């Protein structure tokens, strides 16, 4: 799988597949939805400003009740990334500046993996207790694909 980022441009609104995934994860991890679609730029100092993946309708922020549950959610997303078509996961509370997992990293010869963030290169919310994740475009538009993927994860 390749990382899409914002190549698909801004969406016109919420996308049904991402909303289905967010609702399922909220249920599984007793978590709060902190937001999905919003038309905005990334929260960084990039010049010129860069579109947020939230604006594509493929990114979500979610916060379980405890740090341990957030860690379980992050592990679940990364462990099942191929099946769930997860392209990126942000762990803001890891280390000083957080870390990001991506389905394909240049520095890892295109393989999936974690990158520890620095003061200059980070996800913009160091120390935050929530998780950010991004899904592939084909899943963002298909609650049916999302439901089938969760069934596969749980062996049903």
What are these regions (language model features)?
Residues 8, 135-156:
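Low-complexity, Gly/Ser/Thr/Pro-rich intrinsically disordered linker/tail segments
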Residues 116-124:
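Short proline/glycine-enriched turn/loop segments at secondary-structure junctions
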Residues 1-104, 119, 128-135:
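Secreted/periplasmic proteins that engage bacterial cell-wall peptidoglycan
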Residues 95-96, 108-112, 124:
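Intrinsically disordered, low-complexity coil segments
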């Amino acid at each position: 799988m390749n990382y899409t980022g914002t190549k698909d441009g801004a969406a016109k609104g919420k996308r049904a597949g991402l909303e289905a995934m967010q609702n399922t994860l909220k249920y599984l991890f007793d978590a709060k939805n902190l937001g999905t679609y919003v038309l905005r730029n990334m929260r960084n100092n990039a010049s010129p400003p860069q579109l947020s993946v939230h604006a594509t309708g493929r990114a979500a922020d979610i916060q379980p009740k405890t740090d341990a549950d957030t860690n379980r959610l992050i592990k679940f997303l990364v462990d099942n990334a191929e099946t769930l078509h997860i392209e990126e996961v942000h762990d803001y509370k890891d280390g000083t500046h957080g870390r990001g997992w991506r389905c394909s990293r240049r520095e890892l010869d295109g393989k999936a993996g974690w990158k520890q963030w620095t003061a200059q290169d980070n996800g913009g919310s160091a120390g935050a207790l929530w998780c950010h994740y991004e899904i592939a475009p084909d899943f963002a538009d298909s609650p049916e694909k999302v439901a089938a993927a969760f069934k596969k994860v749980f062996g049903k």
